[in-house]
């Protein structure tokens, strides 16, 4: 674990090999380690459980439909049609259903963190 600016940076590995880099002040991904083939197509969304391997994730679907079904602690992956090279990750609160605590944007090919939206 590495400490930067008062928070710890670590990595956890889910069964099956998917890994998530996280900050100790919450499961805010600081790098996205989701295989590109498991990302939703541009214009689509996918509910993602950070503790599950890629092959055990729910299928992608319509963003309007999926946005209302994200369980606490899960993420909603979004690929905007006008930003094909980006993945938006909405991180949902682990205790409060429907509450998004952060939206982070990543490069779809490298998984590199790009920006945080407010």
Please identify what each model-predicted range represents.
Residues 3-118:
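Peripheral, non-catalytic segments of secretory and membrane proteins
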């Amino acid at each position: 674990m590495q400490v930067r600016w008062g928070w710890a940076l670590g990595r956890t590995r889910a069964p099956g090999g998917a890994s998530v880099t996280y900050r100790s002040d919450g499961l805010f991904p600081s790098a996205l380690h989701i295989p590109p083939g498991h990302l939703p197509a541009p214009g689509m969304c996918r509910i993602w459980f950070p503790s599950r391997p890629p092959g055990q994730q729910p299928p992608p679907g319509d963003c309007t439909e999926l946005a209302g079904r994200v369980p606490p602690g899960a993420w909603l992956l979004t690929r905007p049609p006008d930003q094909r090279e980006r993945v938006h990750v909405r991180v949902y609160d682990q205790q409060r259903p429907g509450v998004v605590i952060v939206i982070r944007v990543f490069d779809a090919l490298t998984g590199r963190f790009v920006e945080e939206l407010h």
